[in-house]
């Protein structure tokens, strides 16, 4: 019989146990390396490729978004420039319309003033002609009363009327 192990020998296995355990460990390691590792590597490579693909897609999406943003900003800038141009054109057109309306109003006012002036002048001439006729008749009647007889000679009447009108015009 064998002697019973004591102390630390209880925890140290026999040499044959260590050898057989190493042989089994090597066989399991080779089997694992040959059969399971390629499948694990394939799965891990596939996942890595998917992740890389997703990263590339995300990068492409970011680039597309940046391009779309740049395009949008360019269009927005162009729209702002166009809006400013339209606004400036509208202001210029409004100024032009106002200037045209003002010049037409001034022209119309000048025409109305000239027409009124002509009308006043015409009425003045009519008043003078009417006044000459009335003054002539009054002067003839007055002269006839002063002289006591009716003036019958047209030339004398005419010269007398003209001299009285000239006197009235000079007093004015």
UniProtKB/Swiss-Prot annotation:
Record note on quaternary structure: F-type ATPases have 2 components, F(1) - the catalytic core - and F(0) - the membrane proton channel. F(1) has five subunits: alpha(3), beta(3), gamma(1), delta(1), epsilon(1). F(0) has three main subunits: a(1), b(2) and c(10-14). The alpha and beta chains form an alternating ring which encloses part of the gamma chain. F(1) is attached to F(0) by a central stalk formed by the gamma and epsilon chains, while a peripheral stalk is formed by the delta and b chains.
Entries under SUPFAM superfamilies matching the protein: F1F0 ATP synthase subunit B, membrane domain
Keyword DNA-binding (UniProt): no
Transmembrane segments: 18-38
Protein name per UniProt: ATP synthase subunit b
Lineage: Bacteria, Bacillati, Actinomycetota, Actinomycetes, Bifidobacteriales
UniProt xrefs under InterPro entries: ATP_synth_B-like_membr_sf (IPR028987), ATP_synth_b/b'su_bac/chlpt (IPR002146), ATP_synth_F0_bsu_bac (IPR005864), ATP_synthase_B_chain (IPR050059)
Family: Belongs to the ATPase B chain family.
Origin species: Bifidobacterium longum (strain DJO10A)
């Amino acid at each position: 019989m064998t002697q019973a192990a004591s102390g630390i020998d209880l925890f140290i296995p026999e040499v044959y146990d260590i050898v057989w355990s190493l042989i089994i460990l090597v066989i399991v390691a080779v089997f694992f390396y040959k059969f399971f590792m390629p499948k694990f590597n394939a799965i891990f490579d596939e996942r890595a490729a998917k992740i890389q693909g997703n990263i590339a897609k995300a990068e492409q999406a970011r680039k597309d978004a940046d391009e779309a943003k740049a395009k949008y900003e360019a269009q927005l800038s162009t729209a702002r420039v166009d809006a400013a141009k339209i606004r400036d054109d509208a202001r210029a057109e409004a100024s032009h319309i106002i200037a045209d309306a003002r010049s037409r109003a001034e022209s119309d006012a000048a025409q109305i003033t000239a027409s009124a002036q002509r009308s006043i002048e015409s009425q003045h001439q009519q008043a003078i002609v009417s006044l000459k006729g009335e003054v002539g008749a009054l002067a003839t009647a007055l002269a006839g009363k002063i002289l006591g007889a009716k003036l019958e000679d047209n030339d004398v009447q005419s010269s007398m009327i003209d001299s009285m009108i000239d006197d009235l015009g000079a007093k004015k």
